[in-house]
Amino acid sequence: MDGQRQQTYIPAPPPPSATQPSQSHMLSLPPPPPRHLPTQPQGVMPPPPPGPPPGPPPGPGYGASKLANSQLQQQNNLGWQHNWARQALSQGFLPPPPPPPMVPTNQAYGRQTSFSVPNADGPITSATYVPGSNTFGAGVGIPGFDAHTRPSYEAYGTMSGSDRIRGPVHHLYESSGGDGSAYKRDGTVPPTPSARTMPSSLALHDNAQESVASSLPGATAQNHQSQTGQTNEPTKSPSHRQNNSNTLLGGMSPSEAAVQWPLDRVLLWLAKNGFSRDWQETFKTLQIEGADFLDIGHGANGRGNFNKMHNEVFPQLAKECEASGTGWDKERELGEGKRMRRLIRQIHDDDSFDVGIPAQKRRESQAPSEGAPDTSPKLSHEPQSAGPHSGTIENSPNLRAPQLAQPHRHSVQMRSVTLPIPTTHDIASSDFSQKDGISSRSDFSRSVLVGLGVDHRRQSPSMSSDNGNLVAPFRSYEDSPKSGSPATQHATLNQGLSSSSTGDLSVKYEHSRGNSSDSTMGRRYYESRKGQETIRPSPQEMCSRQWTGETSSSYPKEHKGIFNFLKKRSKGGDSTHPSPEEPNLESPTSPVNLRQNGPHLPYTKPSFNASDMSLGERPSSASMSDHERLRGKPAQKGKKWSFVTLDGWNYRLVDITDMDSVETLRAAICHNLGIADWASAQIFLTEPGQSDHEEPLNDTMLALCRRTKSDSIGSLKLFVRGTHLQPVPNHVPNFAGLGVPLPDKHTASPTHHLPRKPLDDEALSRIPPQPQTGPASPQLGIRPQQPKTPAAKFPARDAPQHTEGMSPVEGDQQVGISPEPDKADLLARHEEHKREVERKQKAYLSSKGPPQPRNDSYGETGYRRAGVIDFDERRVSPYEDKKADTLVPLRKPPSAPQESYTLTRINSLRKKDGDRPRAQPAVQTHGLGAVLASMGRMTSAIGTPAPSVPTPTSAGGKQTNFGSFGSPTQGNTKSAPQSSPEKESLDNPGNPAEHRHTKSTAPEIPKPTLQSRKSYGPEFDFEETEVSFQRSPRPQDDSDEDSDDGLFAIPLSNNKASTKENDSGSGTSEAQKRTEKPALTVNTESRLRKGLSVSFRSPSATRESFADANGDSGGREGASFLMAASPEDERPPPRRDSFARGDIWASRPPVEGVIDNLDDFFPDIDLDAPYLDGQGVSPPSSPANRAPPENDLHKKENQPSSSYTGEMNANAGDTLGSNEPTLKPQGGDVVARRNINRSGGGLTRGKSIREVAKGANQASRSRSIHTGNQKSGEILRRKSTKMFGAKIMQIKPKPGSRLSQLDPIPQNNTPSGVPQRQPTFRIIRGQLIGKGTYGRVYLGINADNGEVLAVKQVEINPRLAGQDTDRVKEMVAAMDQEIDTMQHLEHPNIVQYLGCERGEFSISIYLEYISGGSIGSCLRKHGKFEESVVKSLTRQTLSGLAYLHDQGILHRDLKADNILLDLDGTCKISDFGISKKTDDIYGNDSSNSMQGSVFWMAPEVIQSQGQGYSAKVDIWSLGCVVLEMFAGRRPWSKEEAIGAIFKLGSLSQAPPIPDDVSMTISPAALAFMYDCFTVPYRDSSERPTAQTLLTRHPFCEEDPNYNFLDTELYAKIRHVL
């Protein structure tokens, strides 16, 4: 019989007519003895009467005859054709009439080629199994476990399909014939071979062993279930069609398919396999059923009907998705289609696959527990012959050889897929046994099945249904919880690989991949054994498939069901469960399977591998895994994981699947991290690498995050900030393998009792009680995470602790619950390892990461620690990347300036001066220096407005401290003998330079000098300068000293006053004065930058004052350093809001606002550094600049070193005068002489730029304003100083640096002894306030007279200059022309040109500063103007335009953006970049080119054609400006440039006046625009001139009642600041 079965499996060469040979072949087979017909469980249709063609029993031939097509033959080739009457079994429905005869060459992909071709006359099956007390299976009479050797099995395998059908048709097991008819038969009733009674699908199955496998009881059950809607897991039989059948659909003929797969069953199948309602509606609409349905997955070519899917199904599906509101997701639906094809292919392989068995259930049920006998008798009892895995090879000798012989079958198209094994399968299997009347099932098998968890029972449907052969002996293995699918295990184990389904059965979602497909078949294996062992493929097929690694998982796709994915994931967590993606899973016998299932699995042996499904029939696990991947494991309703971390380094995996309540979730997370007080812990969303966490998650957000972000791959990552992880500071945290300390037993929740702490005797003794009893979540109990300790940073390594084969959570739980001795031993070792890890972690954390728990004692007043807390020493904050700047009462000092070349020279000069003995008494209080040193240079420099600036000791030897406020120096100052000379005060760390200076004076001083120099290199220079200055204050030179004192010792808010005080006061009195006026500080830093001069900070600056004018040179240096370090210095030049946005370039503050906010507009300038001559307030006009040559001379002397940023020049010279003398070892008298020179004969102190600017502003207010059309209420107009012909030096700070740090401001120095003939103006450039076509406009201030002006700078790219010299020359010439043209213009409505400065690659034009903004910017910002404003502005513009035309100047670019509007309502024409001077202003000049802005151009400019144009183009542009002011937008606002050019040039059209404008403005205004827009036909003479419009047009009449200050526009623009 084995041989016969083999023959049955071996497809006979197709006879001329497949029907006849197959029938004859079937006829040759003796029908099995009639058996009592089992009731048709699960709605199985009663066996149909014998098929109309009274032919041979349903054997391969029968099927062939029915299929009568090449497909059938191919399937026969697959090897399923002959072997099994599965077709009959799989069909619960009446078999369709046999198809026309065809050659029975249906070999399943040549699977049976290894077998000898059975005789056509020979019976497909040698005999029919007679059910016995120990048999099971619907009508199959499957022998009891280990009874495979019974001839009945063999006979059963050879039974004709009709015979089987008779019995099986009634059984719960549905044949996977694809018809969906559950030919579930009583296991006790042998099917009667009858082609008639067998459904066409059965015949097909005969041809296709896979189909037959589906017809196995399991398959039948499935099919039937699918039809009946029951959840019983029918076994699937691989479709031969999938393999090689060309004519067979799903292993059945079209007629069989129609019977097996009616539309209802198709829809049910779709629903059970998780396809959306859109898919169901699509199939319903398209009436896809029967052969059409099966054809989708396995067409005639064995690949599936892609055309139908893409041309019909997907278009209709898209419509359904849109109609249902789901939305068409092409990628998703393509994936679904792919999954569907795989599932249908599995149906072909195992017809019962789809039958109403949810993939999830199947998976669960199919997975037999590892090492346990198959829970389903079907599995264990299925004869090997029934399927590749059906019987153990041992049971059926034929199986072994065939398996080996048919390995090629595994290469069949069948893909092994991880299929969810419906839990119902096991249930179904048990149900089948009952329903089918399979009392024959042995009690042992039944007990085994019962023992298996539903999940574990999950059998490989392919095995149960397709192969129908389950090795009974392997039941024990199936029981093994680790075998996800008993069948799979058997089959896959044989191959050495078990699908993830073979993994622990404990995991519901066992992976039923290729291997799993075996497992799925295994499930069917139970069923098939139960219901249709007759349909089992020949053992050969089974063996071959399994050995080949082919897994005919009935549910390759089903496994991909959501639940399957979940199952897989859960298993995946377990080391024993390979992830579905494991490629090794493809082979049922892959080592993975063996590993997971262990040697106990039934299929570890080749014989066991023989399952009903041939490996070839089974879809490869790879395909299954692919499907699962495609499907997305998240779809599994499995575990949800979250990564939680205490330190952002080490993450704990927490199972939050069942954490429905927020409290439970928080507790679980905190317990896993070892946080005892979970209620007070804060949880934040985080991502790897994230360090800052803003808001902790509240309960609502935490629950939302859990729902939306948690998944099986741990996408949800949480950062937990606990209060006290380890309540006992001395307690050494226990570490789980992850390196996370475990909470103490008392701190951990009961669930955390797992012995994760270091296992000492006590811990070991606690292990038994520790089993968590119902922890909120297994993880909680399982994994108490250690509290956030240093160790927490290390990646958790407890994972090893989890028992193998369990998910970490499970492992923990088990450990806690029942630690075995060996486990305890293991835990002990782990604990030892943990201790080591903990130690390392502590070391690591101590060096990196959050600070470790404080060891300090905590008292009522807070933490206390031993030792002295030095508040001067800032503690390092873990939250700061860089050391915070030392806190000081004043502004932060900028970083110490780098010593520039100038400073170097100055230093050298100063050194020389320092080398000179100073008059200062050598007696210097070391205490002062020491104190200052202890305070730190920053403290000394910044801590006090004026760090002690001891005045040089008076001649009497008294040391005058220049107000070192609060510094020890002052105290010393009081005692002149103690206080060191100014140098000494310089000795203070704050005054490094002073130290240097003192260095020469006394050795003590030099040391401090060195220190100070280290800290302040540049200060040293200043100090030296101060030293020299100090010399001048030497006691010997009382006058100098006094002058020095006046300059440095006594900080005065008023420079003059300070000067006076300095002159009069003694050193001590000066120090006192300083004390009185702490606001005044000497800006040594600025001095440093100047290099030559010492500058004082005005009280407003409140920067550290120099300790001493003379001796404080070093102190000044420190002070200057501090001043340089002042926040102003450090602060990046802020761009004022008014200049920050391009739309308000013109929103410039009035001059008063600029003066009041000089620091904002000149951020890099030390405005308080005294650098101007002390002649008094320099008048706003150039005369101030024209300082007497003496002053210049004196400045020159002082300024070489001091030349500050221009601001500090004169005063710096004065202040630095002392220093300068140091540079120029001239003695203290030099300072006095310099002062005298500056003042023109008397000692004076320099003025700061701020003072000069304020004085100029006040003077301008006090004097009458000379403005052409001054209006009431308009702001006073300044007459700016013309600088043409004068020498202009522009001083601009380098980006990010204070001007004081730059080279000294050039001083108005004239050669000594030579009178200064040419006035020199030093212009300090400030903020950018505008951008133009040809350059940028900066705010500027005349350092000599305090006037505010605008600096228009045009820079030429040096590269461009080198490449295009001609262009550069042309540009320069144009600029020169503009300057020459405009320098003499002076009109209240024209921006004044004040001067220019030419550089090698730039030209700077100095213009009158106009506050407010351009009319264009105001329009854009505030909208259109009211008519009264437009009228006034038009009149003013015409006035300026008439003046220009009178001067022979064409503006040629008149537009709103080029008319500036002052805050007083005065407008001024600006931007003469393309203006042109001509003799005949109103005569057309052919040389005039097309210049200007298109939208404001006159037609003649565009149409010039050599005729040229006159100044009347400006009148046209003025009309455009008026229209622009009325409309609030540019002319031709609806046209692009090209359109405007066309209409102007070709049509000579004027810009249209919008209706909203024409309807609201006065007729005079409208007439004015029309007059301006006069289009010249021959020339522009018809257009009025500016003077005509100004004097004669009614719109330009002056309104005596108009006051700009009362207009809405003024209200909008007045708040510029």
UniProtKB/Swiss-Prot annotation:
Residue ranges of every copy of the Protein kinase domain listed in the record: 1323-1596
Biased composition (Basic and acidic residues): 524-533, 832-841, 871-885, 1128-1140, 1189-1198
Residues noted as binding ATP in the record, renumbered to the chain: 1329-1337, 1352
Reactions catalysed according to its record: L-seryl-[protein] + ATP = O-phospho-L-seryl-[protein] + ADP + H(+); L-threonyl-[protein] + ATP = O-phospho-L-threonyl-[protein] + ADP + H(+)
Record field: compositional bias (Pro residues): 44-60
PROSITE patterns: PROTEIN_KINASE_ATP, PROTEIN_KINASE_DOM, PROTEIN_KINASE_ST
Molecular function terms from GO: ATP binding; protein kinase activity
Family, as annotated: Belongs to the protein kinase superfamily. STE Ser/Thr protein kinase family. MAP kinase kinase subfamily.
Function, in words: Mitogen-activated kinase kinase kinase (MAPKKK), part of the cell wall integrity (CWI) signaling pathway composed by three protein kinases bck1, mkk2 and mpkA and responsible for the maintaining of cell-wall integrity balance. The CWI pathway also regulates the oxidative stress response, as well as the production of some secondary metabolites including pyomelanin.
Protein name in the entry: Mitogen-activated protein kinase kinae kinase bck1
Gene it is expressed from: bck1
